[in-house]
């Protein structure tokens, strides 16, 4: 999150905050990135400047004022659609119009909204070398089993990992699914501010998307190896506005690199009087990594699950083998979990029951 420190840039940032940003969300049938005559425009898609959230009108159009603490505009990717790593735009000086093309992506979403997704975390790679095997295994499984999306909850990690990982695993490489990334403590690296490189490669550190009857929210870890520019207040104020457009019929699942501060009532906010009551909003689960273990716990007071997943690349410190977690979400947002081991090549064994 780029918060301008140099006095010489304050003027342009002020103008950015005062700008009116407009655009449309549309189904890009020919995938040329342009809104062509006859292409469908999508109604009621949330669009945000990092603070304010609006929804597109019947013509697929939106208008936002801009926010000085966020250099992006981004959409809540609607269910049944995907973008090729482009659910966001970095705001450019002098440009005020940003159209968002989306493509149909119904694979893995059943008629009742139920679906499956894959959770990975803490891959902590140093480069592409030595990682293609587990990535291919993950991608092949996703394609064969019609997985709705893959989510990585951070620690990609350090400069070398951040630069390499996006080339190994991204939405453009997969035909009928998509991948979303979150930021971990080891993804806050040296630069003008901790999340600078992550933003350059992966986009905003908080955002949301819809799949079936579930609203998914990615949130950033609040501390790390280097100081981030974003604050909990930034995340809270955006999340509050984001959830204002989520109907009561939808369940909510939150992603983060670690556990929330409040694992009793799951209230996310600034104080005892200013917070979001996530269970009251429909929170079903909080998925995270960080601890390099596999752990599932249902909290008695709220019924919310906290689900930790280790790395698919080399196993966990709990001696768990390399694996990725497959989660099934039913029409009411209830979650079931299973594991699939990494590095397993396809094989067929023919046996005789008589011998």
Listing of model-derived features with the role each one plays in the protein:
Residues 78-83, 90, 103, 163-246, ...:
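Extended active-site neighborhood of metal-dependent phosphoesterases/phosphodiesterases
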Residues 29, 35, 41, 48-61, ...:
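Short, acidic Ser/Thr/Gly-rich low-complexity loop/linker segments typical of extracellular
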Residues 246-264:
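Short acidic, glycine-rich surface-loop motifs adjacent to enzyme active sites
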Residues 52-53, 68-82:
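A short, solvent-exposed beta-strand micro-motif common in secreted/extracellular proteins
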Residues 122, 154-155, 184-185, 257, ...:
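Active-site glycine-centered loops adjacent to acidic/histidine catalytic or metal-binding residues
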Residues 328-355:
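A short C-terminal boundary segment appended to hydrolase-like catalytic domains
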Residues 21-27:
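A short, amphipathic beta-strand motif
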Residues 29, 90-164:
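N-terminal active-site segment of His-dependent metallophosphoesterases
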């Amino acid at each position: 999150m780029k918060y301008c420190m140099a006095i010489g840039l304050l003027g342009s940032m002020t103008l950015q905050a005062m700008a009116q940003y407009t655009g449309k969300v549309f189904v890009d049938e020919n995938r040329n990135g342009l809104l062509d005559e006859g292409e469908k425009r999508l109604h009621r898609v949330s669009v945000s400047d990092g603070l304010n959230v609006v929804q597109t009108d019947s013509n697929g159009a939106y208008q936002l004022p801009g926010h000085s603490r966020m250099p992006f505009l981004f959409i809540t990717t609607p269910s049944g659609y995907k973008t090729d790593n482009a659910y966001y735009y970095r705001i450019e000086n002098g440009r005020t119009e940003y159209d968002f093309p989306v493509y149909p992506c119904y694979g893995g979403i059943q008629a009742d909204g139920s679906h499956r997704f894959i959770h990975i975390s803490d891959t902590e790679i140093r480069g592409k070398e030595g990682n293609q095997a587990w990535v291919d295994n993950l991608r092949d499984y996703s394609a064969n089993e019609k997985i709705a999306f893959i989510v990585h909850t951070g620690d990609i990690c350090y400069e070398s990992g951040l630069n390499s990982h996006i080339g190994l695993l991204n939405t453009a490489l997969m035909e009928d699914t998509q991948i979303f990334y979150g930021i971990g403590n080891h993804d806050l690296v040296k630069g003008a501010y901790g999340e600078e490189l992550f933003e350059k490669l992966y986009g905003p550190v908080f955002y949301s998307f819809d799949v079936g009857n579930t609203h998914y929210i990615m949130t950033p870890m609040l501390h790390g190896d280097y100081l981030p520019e974003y604050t909990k207040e930034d995340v809270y104020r955006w999340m509050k506005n984001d959830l204002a457009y989520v109907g009561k019929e939808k369940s909510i699942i939150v992603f983060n690199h670690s556990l929330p501060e409040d694992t009793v009532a799951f209230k996310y906010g600034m104080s005892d009087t200013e917070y979001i009551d996530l269970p009251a909003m429909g929170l079903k689960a909080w998925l995270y990594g960080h601890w390099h273990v596999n752990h599932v716990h249902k909290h008695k007071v709220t019924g919310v699950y906290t689900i930790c997943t280790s790395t698919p690349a080399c196993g966990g410190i709990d001696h768990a083998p390399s694996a990725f977690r497959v989660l099934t979400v039913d029409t009411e947002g209830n979650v079931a979990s299973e594991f699939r081991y990494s590095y397993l090549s396809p094989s067929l064994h023919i046996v005789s029951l008589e011998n």
